[in-house]
Amino acid sequence: MGKKLGIHAYGNVGRNVARIAKGIGMDIYAYDTYCPKEVMEADGIKPVDSAEELYATCNVVSLHIPATAETKNSINYDLVNRMPKNGLLVNTARKEVINEADLLRLMNDRPDLKYVTDIMPAHHEEFADHFPGRYFSTPKKMGAQTAEANINAGIAAARQIVGFLKDAVSYTHLRAHETRHDL
């Protein structure tokens, strides 16, 4: 296939996207500040040193970053503009990580760029009207709406309640890691 896929955040979802993309012959690159490069390399992934390098290298970038104070609006004009000609940005993370004003301006400046997201952005009408055939969104967030995800969320909640009642322990889940807080 010859296409290069960039995984922006190599957590559980990013790993599964990489696994599927490898199965169709894509070259996989990843950037994640929390995941050791050795983990990515063991999975046959090519780690890169920065988000800028990831976007400059890959034809397709798949976003999996959480919406935090440091990541909100971090996917901006300068970063996405590094993508090669005919780049495709796929956002299955959160809409808050996208600087929509920047992305609108960039898509106007770069008629080769495409954007796909699983949650309708605030500026959906502008994207749809100005960029037909280059933009697609679902009407609501779809990422966690599977039977398996809902079952796993229920099990995790039950374990946290039992842990709190039994041992006065609270757990916070961040990405693929778990942090314990003794109360």
Positions of PLM-derived features:
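Glycine-rich NAD(P)-binding loop of Rossmann-like domains
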Residues: 1-16
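Conserved S-adenosyl-L-methionine
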Residues: 23-26
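Conserved beta-strand positions in the Rossmann-like core of class I SAM-dependent methyltransferases
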Residues: 29
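Conserved acidic E/D residue at the C-terminus of a beta-strand in Rossmann-like folds
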Residues: 32
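Rossmann-like adenosine-cofactor binding region
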Residues: 35-129
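Adenosine-phosphate binding glycine-rich loop
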Residues: 119-169
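Conserved small/polar residues in nucleotide/adenosyl-binding loops
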Residues: 172-179
